[in-house]
Amino acid sequence: CHIGGNSMGGFVSLRFALDYPERLISMTLFNNAGVVGANESKLQIEAQAGKNPLEIHSPDDVKRMLAFVAHKPMKIPGQFRKIFYEDFAVHRELLDKIFWNLVEDGTGKPLNDQLDQVKAPTLIIWGRHDQLIDVSCVNVLEDGIPNAESVVFEDVGHVPMIENPKG
């Protein structure tokens, strides 16, 4: 199969590549979690201070969170911010638990030393201004995965497929 994922989905893709190498033809990673680069991200610094910068407490926080995720502001109409907030509020406890588990797994149990076991050709796509997972992870991935190449987009944050879909 061909697999790809962004952020946590990229971590799942990478884990799949390690666990089922015989089933994988190729992989695309977009700003994936699961490795530690030379530099800490703004999210890691906030998390070390006990803060979750992705947490939403009001519809206005949706705007702040999206500005943290994307390099250029995303325009989301007020009614959609309200819906986004309401969905987040329903699942706040679970989302917070997932966030802290990812922070722990991403920094406490990184896959850096297993990357050489990835056999599938891998394309690494990253936004230079990712505040969630530092762009220094690109070098770790490209150096660690034997058949990998990377593309780093300028003026893009954590979601290159949304911020620069034609890239």
Residue ranges: model-predicted function:
Residues V118, I124-W126, D130:
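Short beta-strand/loop motif that positions the catalytic acidic residue
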Residues C1-S7:
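Alpha/beta-hydrolase fold nucleophile elbow
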Residues S7-G10, Y20:
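Active-site loop->helix "elbow" adjoining a glycine-rich segment at hydrolase catalytic centers
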Residues F153-K166:
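Catalytic histidine-centered segment of alpha/beta-hydrolase-like enzymes
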Residues Q131-C137:
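Conserved alpha/beta-hydrolase "acid-adjacent" motif
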Residues R23-I25, I145-A148, V156:
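Core-facing hydrophobic residues within beta-strands of well-ordered domains
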Residues A38-L43, I56-Q117:
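Conserved alpha/beta-hydrolase catalytic His-Asp/Glu region
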Residues L14-D19, R23-S58:
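Flexible "cap/lid" loop of the alpha/beta hydrolase fold
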